């Protein structure tokens, strides 16, 4: 009897990682499906990879001297991320000053993080937003946040073009951050508008953290 109990215990313990992985996969699938549904609602061309729970799309920015936007959505077991980067790499000589500027701006942002990432030995400026979501209780608020924060991320990257250009023209991170502070002014109260914004996304109540220069 003791041997049988021991064997059953070993089998039960062996199944725990398998069950945990299955639960994680189901949670990721739920959040991936949410992302897919919301993005399909605005009729955007996208590439979806169900195996990695990732969705990719390209988007033309109003200001594209640094390239257009590469947007990547990733679904995890308890969160989704929205990552927007420029399609053109940064000049490596600018990287230290851009990182310094981004670090200063990040300390003031309401949501998300500006960063410089390295891929295939080239550097890209990016902005990432992390959204915590309960995969077993996805609310309308969670769904609305997908498009609302995608629009916010795109607006942020449009605004950053001018500041990165100033750095490319020889301004220091300190001076460019001072420009950003002067531009941002007082935080505006969010307003609900009818119709769709310039990205084609339905408008939502989102924090306005950047003002166009």
Indicate residue ranges for each PLM-predicted region.
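Ser/Thr-rich, low-complexity intrinsically disordered terminal regions
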Residues: 33, 37-91
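Bacterial N-terminal signal peptides
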Residues: 8-16
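Positively charged n-region of N-terminal signal peptides that target proteins for export
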Residues: 1-4
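Positively charged N-terminal leader segments that act as targeting/secretion signals
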Residues: 192-208
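A short acidic/glycine-rich loop-to-helix N-cap element
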Residues: 133-150
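Short, internal acidic amphipathic alpha-helical interface segments
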Residues: 83-128, 132, 167
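Short, highly charged C-terminal tails/helix-capping segments
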Residues: 163-193
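Sec-dependent signal peptide cleavage junction
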Residues: 18-24
């Amino acid at each position: 009897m003791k041997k049988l109990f021991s064997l059953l215990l070993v089998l039960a313990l062996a199944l725990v990682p398998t069950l945990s992985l299955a639960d994680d996969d189901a949670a990721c699938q739920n959040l991936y499906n949410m992302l897919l549904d919301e993005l399909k609602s605005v009729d955007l061309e996208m590439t979806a990879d169900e195996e990695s729970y990732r969705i990719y799309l390209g988007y033309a920015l109003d200001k594209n001297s640094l390239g257009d936007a590469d947007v990547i959505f990733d679904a995890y077991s308890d969160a989704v991320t929205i990552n927007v980067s420029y399609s053109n790499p940064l000049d490596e000589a600018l990287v230290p000053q851009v990182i310094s500027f981004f670090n200063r701006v990040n300390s003031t942002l309401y949501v998300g993080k500006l960063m410089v990432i390295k891929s295939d030995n080239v550097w890209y400026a990016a902005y990432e937003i992390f959204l915590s979501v309960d995969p077993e209780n996805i609310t309308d608020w969670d769904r609305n946040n997908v498009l609302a924060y995608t629009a916010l991320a795109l607006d942020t990257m449009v605004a950053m073009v001018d500041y990165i250009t100033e750095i490319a023209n020889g301004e220091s991170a300190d001076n460019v951050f001072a420009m950003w502070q002067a531009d941002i002014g007082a935080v505006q109260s969010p307003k609900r508008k009818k119709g769709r914004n310039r990205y084609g996304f339905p408008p939502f109540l989102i924090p306005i953290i950047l003002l166009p220069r």
